[in-house]
């Protein structure tokens, strides 16, 4: 045998020995992993033989190890547990070192769920990348155990969440897998991942028709040829599996399935210590990832946007924390700005990065920076819903493979979270421990500790914001700083998006901004107003996936490019200028083509807002401002800022280098001028060569602006799709409003009642003593005064409450009902018969299915395994590609109570307090009496109007008769050719009588008008006015003639 073959075999084989003295000394990590006792297992006696330090057997090192391996095979110890026929020892060649117990894995296979639930887990694996002991903090017995799970390793497999759905509390893979997906080759630091991948690979490479070898015999021990042949076959099979899909995309796009090739479902309710945690993009190199950890392992999933990730985290957390909205909890928000460091040793390539550790848990890391002297990062990290912590550590570590620690900054969070800390956070130069003298790190830390109450305590606050956000914004606009406006607008948008009013908020604020600017289009969305900040936050929420699809790929290519596009003659050599101009024009062409062809994936919610703005401009008579309003919001506040700073919008993992950053700046200038229809002038004369580009693509840009502002009749904007922790968002809003109202003048506070009263009640922990008016249509004052002694006010001061109804608010009745249990059995007099469900008929296009049974709302009968719940929509939902357009159940907690199974078929009107029954009966009696009085008044008015109509008809007939007689007399006189001697006297008499008749007609018209006004005024029954002069029937005419 050749020495090379022997060396390969010695580094590959596992040995199993009874005598521990014959084995190599265990590594330090193995000693640490065995600190806790564990149940005996036959796998604990396996050791990995490498070329490390150990005893050399007689006859040379290599052959001595080979002899030791043979001695281990000849001295087999009996198995502790009864096992089936022993497997071939050669089959353990490609297995990972010690096998995991099945209960220690995620229970992937369907056959594993009903079995092996009582198997004791093995010892946890040691962390392959342990921090340096000399820089570790001293253990503090009072320090709380970090609730943040351990971060994944960079080579940990990431699953695409599009291939999963949440059904009945189980995370289920969509479809059946024929075999393992593509294997992503990584380092050997993730032993669990490689073990699962290789363990699943052995079944895929098995040749059809070939049975598994029987138990190992004595002749297999020395048969090295067969062993090497099996090694080559499995290596070839692995390479064939990885040769079908190109490796040029991110792991999630390639459908990574390393560790979970046989995944079927994960029951969150059956696992212990389940936690769902969002991951910073710097940990895995992918944006919008989250991690699911449990007592036996962890998984990482990637999403398409932050809204999709937040929605999945919410749905998963509600599976094992169903009462999250009904309990009080403490949470923390942490924001860290890592600016720069100086005084450190020279940072060679690949550079030095800063890592954020919170109570021993890694949160994020910066991009590496190399070079002599000062290192500049300027990165911002924001974390929400963190568990309470005490200590923040910023560790400067080398970005190389060794990862040597350069120094650290330790900060007690009590210094930052005290009430006297500045609102913007604590910013200063922190000394770096473990580094040369004079090394400092400039950072800014802001910590906010929040007391999150049950969501029902914020009910009145959410109602006030939902119905009176315009009044609130108008009153607070002049009194807030730019930072306060940004924070308040973000909190309002998140809360109103949960209640379904965010689109109306943005539409109304945009219309108000248009009225405030007064037609000065140059000021639209260019100032620090609540409207501008709210629109920024709303577009980031609804258009994040749109940004990824439109600009993600092209911006990442530009960030990775090394081509220079500088066109300023003062910064570029003259011979290179034409080439740079051509590159810039091509890059602008590519970006512009991606934008104008992105209409199909444009968010429908944003299109509806733009359409409403254009309608408002048209109603104001300034229709030309409609495209300017759309352009100022879409390009000035979203697309061009995303091109300028791609890392802030999730388009790039870090801020681009100076060269690509200059290219992105020039492209953003061109796109913004193209949207504004503004050519480059004398201020930027070096960009004048792009004016022809602006002229050529101007019509296409205007067509795109018209497209995005047109609402498709077949497309309905989707509802809420973001994070659902409404209690946390309302707690943030409550803290912000309390801070604002503490410095607000009393006149403004009085104008915003009942909001100050609501804030004080929530702060003091007592029931809210007021109700929020809901903008319901008001009854006419005259009709209301007929049966009400006085109008009931929408807001009552606490001192005036005894004068009106008893103090029973809506939130108090809701809390009393929920405190008794929403699924508690009702009294016999309150029970209502349940409605029978309407049978659903199958259409011809849907295939026949097995009939399902409805789950009863109460009872101890368990639901059959695998059956679907027929009650309200579950917290999880089937996932499809178009996730942003899926409908969603109400995320407002007090509306979600209506969807609980126990209350689905029960009447919601039986929860009113019994103490108000007598008052309600009195009000009903008053309403009935008032209704009877109104009925009698209407009947009398109808009779009077009918009599007046008859009198008017009689007068009209008399007037027509008089006109006919007058015409006959005049015609008779004309036929005789002259008038009699006394004709002049008679003519004057006729004219006088005609004048009297006209006066009578005017008097009759006035009477009719007074009767019509009388019919609208209840309680007045006046008779028609008598005529001042008797009616003349014209008898004198016949006598005169």
From Swiss-Prot:
Residues 218-243, 931-1013 form a coiled coil. One of its GO terms (molecular function) is GTPase activator activity. GO terms for cellular component: cell cortex; cytoplasm; cytoplasmic side of membrane. Residues 1-59, 234-256, 790-910, 1016-1041 are annotated as: Disordered. The keyword Coiled coil applies. Predominantly expressed in hematopoietic tissues. Residues 850-866 have a biased composition (Basic residues). It is found in: Cytoplasm; Cytoplasm, Cell cortex. CDD domains: RasGAP_DAB2IP (cd05136). Pfam families: PH_RASGAP, RasGAP. GO terms for biological process: negative regulation of Ras protein signal transduction; positive regulation of NK T cell proliferation. Residues 220-321 form the PH domain. Residues 34-44 have a biased composition (Polar residues). Residues 500-708 form the Ras-GAP domain. SMART domains: RasGAP. PROSITE patterns: C2, RAS_GTPASE_ACTIV_1, RAS_GTPASE_ACTIV_2. Residues 312-430 form the C2 domain. Disruption phenotype: No visible phenotype. The number of natural killer T (NKT) cells in the liver is selectively decreased (around 50%) in mutant mice. Disulfide bonds: none annotated. The record marks 526 as: Arginine finger. The modification Phosphothreonine is found at residue 262. It comes from the Eukaryota. Functions as a Ras GTPase-activating protein. Plays an important role in the expansion and functions of natural killer T (NKT) cells in the liver by negatively regulating RAS activity and the down-stream ERK signaling pathway. This is RAS protein activator like-3. It comes from Mus musculus (Mouse). The gene is Rasal3.
